[in-house]
UniProtKB/Swiss-Prot annotation:
Coiled coil: none annotated. This is Elongation factor Ts. Transmembrane segments: none annotated. Keywords: Cytoplasm, Elongation factor, Protein biosynthesis. Residues 76-79 are annotated as: Involved in Mg(2+) ion dislocation from EF-Tu. The lineage of its organism: Bacteria, Bacillati, Actinomycetota, Actinomycetes, Mycobacteriales. Belongs to the EF-Ts family. Gene3D superfamilies: 1.10.286.20, DNA helicase RuvA subunit, C-terminal domain (1.10.8.10), Elongation factor Ts, dimerisation domain (3.30.479.20). It is found in: Cytoplasm. It comes from Corynebacterium glutamicum (strain R).
Amino acid sequence: MANYTAADVKKLRELTGSGMLDCKKALEESAGDFDKAVEILRVKGAKDVGKRAERNATEGLVAVSGNTMIEVNSETDFVAKNSEFKEFAANVADAAAAAKANSQEELAAVDVDGKTADAALQEFSAKIGEKLELRRAVTLEGDKTAVYLHQRSADLPPAVGVLVAFTGEGEAAEAAARQAAMQIAALKASYLTREDVPAEIIEKERSIAEQITREEGKPEQAIPKIVEGRLNGFYKENVLLEQSSVADSKKTVKALLDEAGVTVTSFARFEVGQA
């Protein structure tokens, strides 16, 4: 006959966050000693950390606080949509914003209720039994930011997040900046202007364009012009200000921003599980 009750199991689950089966086993092992059962579960959680470290965390969410955006990963979408996980991520995002965290290392070191975010993460990981990761953080400079968070389905937290730092006044400016954030989420611009594209990337694209053009048998004298045209195509696909706007395909993003008196100074895009 068990020397513990269903109420003991419930209380132990609420206190430790462990599963029902683990709580029952701990109470059996402790012969109903509640405090010892708590200790058993804490030891089990610590041992499980090593096992969890070998698993992949490719689900999760993107959270934003002020000018700061973070990505926190979990193993399953079941945990990603858990209210405790979302609350944990929100608290870390607030701490990251206060510290202006701008890298994974800085994110892991921010203070969350008197402990580092990494330490808080490990405790929470032991509680829920899944590998969790503080993936990355970015903080944009500027007084104004537009935010767009995209959910892949209504029951899941945001999996894509975009922050846009901008200057401009009024509702029209704010709407245009948010539209730019939505554009970045959808079309995945990598650069703000063509001047931001690294020289080695340009040379690589130029080389590929020239190789393709030659293989097509184009006249030698026409090759430079065709290559430049293809390079411009690369810019229009990858440079935000040169993309055709999803809101008005007849205009570039730059044209619509100019109409609203907006200057985008920087942006960042996170997608859960992606580089």
